[in-house]
């Protein structure tokens, strides 16, 4: 993507999403968490890193997730999100450029209230280094694939759910809900109507 087009895309995202400091509030009584939908350019396209959680973890074992985690006492959601990205995939604190936040999502199975932030990781993008005590690895998924409705499959399982297969992993559950919630504004920023 040409530098001017990339800058315009990022600027539109800032206008479309909630401000980082004014995204709303967590669900009362839930465990608070924050994740980051990190956009970076690789080979002329936008990509997003996801983490594959270890199978022996208590919460969401073996699942693919956006980097993020719990918000500590006295910590803002954005500060928690940046800390977790640094811990989980090795992106230095202060490297992310915040673009905004999506609407919080509640996961009743684990009682997490999650705010998804959108951020840009400018070049040069460092190699992602995952935290082995929590994660099995890092997946890099092209934004175009995440926004392609035909790439998402509806399961035939009685518990019907949507998923995206990528590198022998599935993006589903809470992470699918987060991506689906962010997708309309991401699409709008990529292909804006006149005047947007």
Predicted regions and their residues:
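Amphipathic alpha-helical blocks and their helix-capping loop/short-beta junctions
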Residues: 129-158
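N-terminal leader/linker segments that precede catalytic domains of diphosphate-processing enzymes
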Residues: 1-65, 69-124, 144, 152, ...
């Amino acid at each position: 993507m040409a530098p001017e087009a990339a800058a315009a895309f990022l600027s539109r995202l800032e206008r479309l999403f909630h401000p980082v400091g004014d995204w709303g509030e967590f669900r009362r009584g839930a465990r608070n968490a924050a994740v980051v939908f990190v956009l970076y350019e690789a080979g002329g396209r936008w990509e997003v890193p996801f983490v594959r959680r270890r199978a022996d973890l208590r919460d969401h074992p073996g699942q693919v997730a956006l980097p993020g985690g719990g918000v500590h006492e006295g910590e803002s959601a954005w500060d928690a999100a940046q800390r977790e990205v640094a811990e989980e995939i090795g992106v230095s604190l202060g490297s992310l450029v915040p673009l905004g936040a999506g609407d919080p999502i509640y996961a009743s199975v684990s009682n997490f209230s999650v705010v998804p932030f959108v951020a840009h990781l400018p070049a040069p993008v460092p190699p992602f280094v995952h935290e082995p005590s929590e994660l099995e690895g890092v997946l890099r998924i092209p934004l175009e694939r995440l926004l392609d409705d035909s790439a998402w499959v509806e399961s035939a399982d009685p518990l019907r759910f949507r998923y995206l297969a990528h590198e022998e992993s599935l993006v589903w559950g809470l992470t699918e809900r987060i991506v689906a919630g962010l997708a309309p504004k991401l699409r709008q920023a990529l292909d804006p109507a006149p005047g947007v």
